[in-house]
Each structure stands twice: as structure tokens, then as C-alpha cells.
Amino acid sequence: MMKGLIGYRFSPTGEEVINHYLKNKLLGKYWLVDEAISEINILSHKPSKDLPKLARIQSEDLEWYFFSPIEYTNPNKMKMKRTTGSGFWKPTGVDREIRDKRGNGVVIGIKKTLVYHEGKSPHGVRTPWVMHEYHITCLPHHKRKYVVCQVKYKGEAAEISYEPSPSLVSDSHTVIAITGEPEPELQVEQPGKENLLGMSVDDLIEPMNQQEEPQGPHLAPNDDEFIRGLRHVDRGTVEYLFANEENMDGLSMNDLRIPMIVQQEDLSEWEGFNADTFFSDNNNNYNLNVHHQLTPYGDGYLNAFSGYNEGNPPDHELVMQENRNDHMPRKPVTGTIDYSSDSGSDAGSISTTSYQGTSSPNISVGSSSRHLSSCSSTDSCKDLQTCTDPSIISREIRELTQEVKQEIPRAVDAPMNNESSLVKTEKKGLFIVEDAMERNRKKPRFIYLMKMIIGNIISVLLPVKRLIPVKKL
């Protein structure tokens, strides 16, 4: 084997031992396994002397692999034979299942652990020799004729002799006799010869700075073509940077695909840019201005490096601006209604402003007699909200005011009788209505409710006053 490779060793896993070596051995494919594992009868040899020399592959880890035929103690094949000429292999521990990791974890075999004892069974002396015995379970029982024995030595390495195996020596003589030529030997890598990677030691020893490269020590042969394809790049400066070993050691143009330096004269496209005139306002309520964002690079540069949309023009930035200088309400409504009496003392004004379905009434009144409907002792109160004509409301207020002024001097001179009491009650009712309406003049929605309440009170008090006798003063 490859003796010159440090760390190289023959150490297959349990799955590899079962699936490859033992399975191919039982199926008759000896050419796949004989170069790695030799066949012996493990019960015919003493571990302390013979086993290391019989292994096909010698190991410094003090472990060896063998194919061994299965021998049974009785014809029923229920118990395997474990005794040797000077001792016996004693099973210990529990059997471990070996599963095929690439076959959904199916059990393909088991591994038994045994320790070699010198002497007669069951009394014997334990030795540092341990054996892992691999049995296959994925084949029919009549084909299970061999096991793989992994023998390990747990003692000192000085106690083991490493003489060449007689079988290996005989195999080498057989090859010479058949072919007439000795078996080729594996050689360690020598300077000047190619290794597995297709490189020689001379190529690795040769200094990098002795190779002839016209662009510099760190420029690849295809870098010159790449630089010519770039736009807005200072070719001389880039070559100088890549040629400097101290600044960029070991880098090439293939490692860096982004231009490092942009010429100052390429920024001339920005000289005419004015931030004040970049956006323009229109007289529309909602204005949308679309501007193409200027770029110091051309379309070819963007297509070459970004690869945007298979060569389509680069993205444009959309800028939206809304003009709010002439922002006004959509439906402005403003009106004023003035109510004035003949004497000039009674006046009322209503101002209403509406915007988009929202109204805010503002009512201002000049005197105490306004927003009233005519009421009398025999007539019921009329709803002011049903009157849509302002002239009718104003006329009723004036008539009511004049009637109240005419009744005041009559009430002073009239005698105190039942009729005068009714007049006073009527006057009081009118003043109460007037006073209530004045307090609630800013709440038109409650006018009808107040009129109904006051009318009910008057209608109740009038019959009561007629029944109660009034004493003369």
C-alpha cells in the first residue's frame, strides 16, 4: 500500500465491512476484496505470534482484518466453535446491530465482541487481544459461510513482531514467475515528477516573480482585454495598482470586476444641474413630475456590469410632487340671513359655512324677541321649524311683540276678577315662552320641545285658575 502517505490507513466502517467486503466475499467476487483482507482460519493461529504477520495490510494502529470460515460445535449449527490450540475466544458484552445508512436504516449485520483467554475453558487467563466479529444478516442463512474478524491488540506495541507475511512473499514470487517482470513498487514523490494534481515540485519551488508577464506580476493574460472593455476607467492607474505587490498581493482583474477610479472630466454631465429648477410646479391640484435621474455612467456601462433585464435601459427614479399652493375647498358654501324689526332693536343673523358635507351653524341675535311663533290662550303653539319663509317668522314675532306691549297697560288698570286673572296667566305664559326661547335661541332643535312643554303647562293652569276664587285687594 501507500507507505509514504502520512495518516493513510485501512480502517473501514462497520457498514463498509458488511456491504462491500463480506458481501462480495460470500457472493464469490473475490477480486474485489482479496487485495485488502486475507483469508485464514482464526481458530488455527495463536494471536500473540502469527496473526500480525498473516494480515494483508499491516497497520501501526495494532489492528488487522481477516476472513475466517464459520465452524460449528454440532451439526445443528446452533453454536459456533471458539477454542484454539492454546486458548479460547470468550464472547463479552452485547451484540450491536449494523444498519445501512443509505438504505433507510435497514439492519444488514451484527457485530460481536470477544476477548482471547489462554488455557482451558471456562478457566483461563485474560489477554490484551480483542476481536470484533462481523456477521451478515441480509443474505440467506445457507450463504453465511464467512465472517470478518477485526483483531486488536490492547497491550504494548513492542511485544508484536512485524515480519512480512509468507503469503505476501509467495504472491510476489508468483507475479514474477507469470509476467517475467517484478511487481512495480510504489515510490515517494521526487522533485521534477508530476504528482496526482498534475503539478511537480519544481513548479511549486519556482518563484512567482520570475514568470514573464507584460502587464505586471499580478495581471492575468486576459486582464488587458478586460480593461479595454471598461468605460470611464483610468487604465494606467488600474494597472499600477495591480502591479504593486505591497498594496494588492495576489489579486487579479478577475477578482475585482468593479472600476475603482472614475475620471473627473466624466462628471461634466452634472455641471448644468440646478437644484432649484430640478422640480417644476404646475397649476393643477395634483401634479406629477417625472425626471430621469442623471448618472455619470452610460447605458453601456450599466448593461455590461449590472446585466439588468437583458440589456434594457437602466431603471429611472420617479419623483412625485403635489402642488398645494392653490389648495381650496371643493364645495365652499357661505350665506348670511339677517332679520330686522321696524324699531331697529330686533335683529338676527345666521351664518352657515359648509365644506364637504360638514356644517357648523352660527346664530347671533340682537334682542330678546326672535325665533318665536305666535301663541295665544286659544291657539296651540306652531312649530318654527315648519316655517320655511323668513318673512313669515319675522311678521309673527312683530305681531306677538305688539300684542304683549298693548296688554301690559290694560292689565294694570283692569279690576282683579276672573277675567283679569286669565289675562295675567296668558301674559305670564307669553313671557315664559319668550324667555325660554331666548335662552335656547342657539339650539333650534329644542324649540319645538320647549313649546310643547310650555303649552301643556298653560293648558293645565288655565282650568285651575278658573276654579280658584280670587280675593279682591
From Swiss-Prot:
GO terms for biological process: cytokinin-activated signaling pathway; leaf morphogenesis; positive regulation of DNA-templated transcription; regulation of cell division. Residues 326-380 are annotated as: Disordered. Pfam families: NAM. One of its GO terms (molecular function) is DNA-binding transcription factor activity. It comes from the Eukaryota. Residues 340-354, 364-379 have a biased composition (Low complexity). Induction: Stabilized by cytokinins. Residues 4-154 form the NAC domain. One of its GO terms (cellular component) is endoplasmic reticulum membrane. Its main location: membrane. Keywords: Activator, DNA-binding, Membrane, Nucleus, Stress response, Transcription, Transcription regulation, Transmembrane, Transmembrane helix. Gene3D superfamilies: NAC domain. InterPro entries: NAC-dom (IPR003441), NAC_dom_sf (IPR036093). The chain crosses the membrane at residues 446-468. Residues 108-160 bind DNA. Transcription activator activated by proteolytic cleavage through regulated intramembrane proteolysis (RIP) mediated by calpain or its functional homolog. Regulates cytokinin signaling during cell division. This is NAC domain-containing protein 68. It comes from Arabidopsis thaliana. The lineage of its organism: Eukaryota, Viridiplantae, Streptophyta, Embryophyta, Tracheophyta.
